[in-house]
UniProtKB/Swiss-Prot annotation:
Organismal lineage: Viruses, Monodnaviria, Loebvirae, Hofneiviricota, Faserviricetes
Pfam families documented for this protein: DUF3627
Entry protein name: Uncharacterized protein ORF4
Family (UniProt): Belongs to the plectrovirus ORF4 family.
Record-linked InterPro entries: DUF3627 (IPR022549)
Length: 149
């Protein structure tokens, strides 16, 4: 296997992009099929194994070397495994596609994690931050607090 640092020094026109191993459903001796994000498992591109490197820090990821101005045929396999070229994307376009996927993923995760938290709003022009409750809930809370006395 080629050392990643040696390859980068020689080829400045290459972006080494980290992806999850889940994007590589199958591999041959010479190449690996890499899925496009947000597409079915039968749409992607073939990349020579010379451009795929194991991650030293993250065992669930690999680095793929994409040449910015190279044209990669995006293939789509039908149910009979017949190969059809769907379109061509440059290395830059593929990088942008994976970046968009990552950004969407993190946005969805943030919403999923923090959606249930009540939003804080300023009320009655004072400096107290109150949760965004209805008037009924506020009255119920006040009554509950008064009943404690």
């Amino acid at each position: 296997m080629i050392k990643l640092s040696n390859f980068v020094k020689k080829n400045q026109n290459v972006e080494n992009y980290f992806i999850s191993k889940e994007f590589i459903p199958f591999t041959t001796d010479k190449a690996s099929f890499i899925n496009l994000p947000n597409h079915n498992r039968h749409i992607g591109f073939w990349l020579s194994n010379k451009f795929i490197y194991s991650s030293e820090k993250h065992s669930e990821q690999v680095a793929i070397g994409l040449i910015y101005d190279n044209s990669y045929p995006i293939v789509k396999y039908d149910e009979n495994l017949k190969r059809n070229i769907w379109k061509y994307l440059t290395g830059t376009e593929l990088i942008n596609l994976y970046n968009q996927y990552k950004q969407n993923y993190f946005t969805k995760m943030k919403k999923a994690l923090f959606l249930s938290e009540p939003k804080k709003v300023k009320a009655n022009n004072n400096n107290n931050n109150l949760t965004n409750w209805s008037v009924e809930k506020e009255e119920q809370l006040i009554n509950d607090l008064e009943s404690l006395n």
